[in-house]
Swiss-Prot record:
It comes from Halalkalibacterium halodurans (strain ATCC BAA-125 / DSM 18197 / FERM 7344 / JCM 9153 / C-125). Mg(2+) binds at residues 100, 239, 241, 243. Pfam families: PGM_PMM_I, PGM_PMM_II, PGM_PMM_III, PGM_PMM_IV. The active site is at residue 100. Belongs to the phosphohexose mutase family. This is Phosphoglucosamine mutase. Its EC number is 5.4.2.10. Its cofactor is Mg(2+). InterPro entries: A-D-PHexomutase_a/b/a-I, A-D-PHexomutase_a/b/a-I/II/III, A-D-PHexomutase_a/b/a-II, A-D-PHexomutase_a/b/a-III, A-D-PHexomutase_C, A-D-PHexomutase_C_sf, A-D-PHexomutase_CS, Alpha-D-phosphohexomutase_SF.
Length: 447
């Protein structure tokens, strides 16, 4: 990754790392790079519910206007909503202000091209190069400056698109929604109510400061309790920008991205919709998933962690379903990025079409016990150069004797080293993780 761009755009603590000054420059330079060959360029901007969103939006808009770009403000909307609308209204580019599932202090700026896909590496590199140079970009004046307008009705256009991806309404299904006090708060309840579902909601009272705070896809235990309390048929949890989905079955069991991918891949294969009989996953997907897919004669392609890598593999190989255990699910026949609400619709639609409860769909295979820990470090990239970390990993793998696996990697978006272990029992998982974590802490230090 570059100096500014990580695996998912530019991220950092708002107002100290991701400052209004940097947002202004990103707007100005990003606007130039993405629209320099366009006539009458326009750029869409959306944001999640973070308190810093308006501050960064103001700076970003100013930068875009200063380069002569028309800006259409979408207001609070999901990341996939921005991706969809960028292509749908033939905009030159789209920008989302969000740090997804990260805490409220963080924020991020992510660009989309006119096709609704994330930027190419070379486009990000061009923006980065210009960020570090003295500003010699054009400075239009008078009537050549950009103008900004609100396009809040864009959200309705996006919801209409989502609704037409399912076969029928959801009458008779009680759905519990957890919107993470984020972008889905004003979207998901309307979407599922319009489809005649009986809905109960939580995490739908954003105040700028409570996004992802004990709610949403990174805290599915809250939704599990809510599903049980409301006696719902299914629970659907989104993250702050609604590009992820984690589900909960009617018994209160958590159904993660791996389970959702299996359910969707199996259904799509049965309906003749799964291109090349292949599912694209990441190295984080559970061993149990691969064994279950093998039994269904569904092939898998494995990528590095990050939905951008899943998408790259899907586009390269001509596949139409892929995703991550964390809940990024990509339905490439419908949209150009992971979409939590679209994934939720497909999952409920499969329940409706098969007449099965979510627990029945999810219980068709068992996951290997898996333990994941995050270690906060001063330099996450040092994990790849350190000698003692690979040594302890090798030691653990020898102890496993082929009955499990280890993955240690730097986070793409936070100052963390992530350690994942799968083994035959939870006790073994915990023991192996602790053994590796002790070495990572000792070698790389903690902030």
């Amino acid at each position: 990754m570059g100096k500014y761009f990580g695996t998912d755009g530019v991220r950092g603590v708002a107002n100290t790392e991701l400052t209004p000054e940097l947002a202004f420059k990103l707007g100005r330079i990003g606007g130039y790079v993405l629209t320099k060959d366009k006539e009458n360029p326009k750029v869409l901007i959306g944001r999640d519910t973070r308190i810093s969103g308006e501050m960064l939006e103001g700076a970003l808009v100013a930068g875009l206007l200063s380069i002569g770009v028309e800006v259409m403000r979408l207001g609070v909307i999901s990341t996939p909503g921005v991706a969809f609308l960028t292509k749908a209204v033939s905009a030159s580019a789209g920008v989302m202000i969000s740090a997804s599932h990260n805490p409220v202090a963080d924020n991020g700026i992510k660009f989309f091209g006119p096709d609704g896909f994330k930027l190419l590496d070379e486009q990000e590199k061009e923006i980065e190069t210009l960020l570090d140079q003295e500003d010699a970009l054009p400075r239009p004046t008078g009537a050549d400056l950009g103008q900004a307008n609100d396009y809040f009705e864009g959200a309705q256009k996006y919801l209409q698109f989502l609704k037409q991806t399912v076969d029928e309404d959801f009458t008779g299904i009680h759905i519990a929604l957890d919107c993470a006090n984020g972008a889905a708060s004003s979207l998901a309840p309307h979407l599922f109510a319009d489809l005649e579902a009986d809905i109960s909601t939580m995490g739908t009272s954003p105040n700028g400061k409570n996004i992802n705070d004990g709610v949403g896809s990174t805290h599915p235990e809250a939704l599990a309790a809510f599903v049980n309390a409301k006696n719902a048929d299914i629970g659907l949890a989104f993250d702050g920008d609604a590009d992820r989905l984690i589900a909960v079955d009617e018994k209160g069991n958590i159904v993660d991205g791996d389970k959702i991918l299996y359910i969707c891949a199996k259904y799509m294969k049965e309906k003749g919709l799964l291109k090349q009989q292949t599912l694209v996953t990441t190295v984080m997907s559970n061993l149990g998933l691969y064994k279950a897919l093998e039994a269904l004669q569904i092939d898998t392609k494995q990528t590095a962690v990050g939905d951008r890598y899943v998408m790259e593999e899907m586009r390269k190989g001509g596949y139409n379903l892929g995703g991550e255990q964390s809940g990024h699910i990509i339905f490439l026949d419908h949209i150009t990025t992971g979409d939590g609400m679209l994934s939720a619709l497909q999952l409920v639609n499969i329940m409706k079409q098969t007449g099965k409860k979510l627990s029945e769909l999810a219980e068709e295979w068992e996951t290997f016990p898996q333990t994941l820990v995050n270690i906060r470090v001063t330099d996450k990239h040092a994990v790849t150069d350190n000698e003692k970390v690979p040594a302890v990993i090798k030691e653990v793998e020898q102890e496993m004797n082929g009955e499990g696996r280890v993955l240690v990697r730097p986070s793409g978006t936070e100052p963390l080293v992530r350690i994942m272990v799968e083994a035959k029992t939870e006790e073994l998982c915990d023991a192996f993780v602790n053994k590796i974590a002790d070495v990572v802490k000792a070698e790389l230090g903690q902030e």
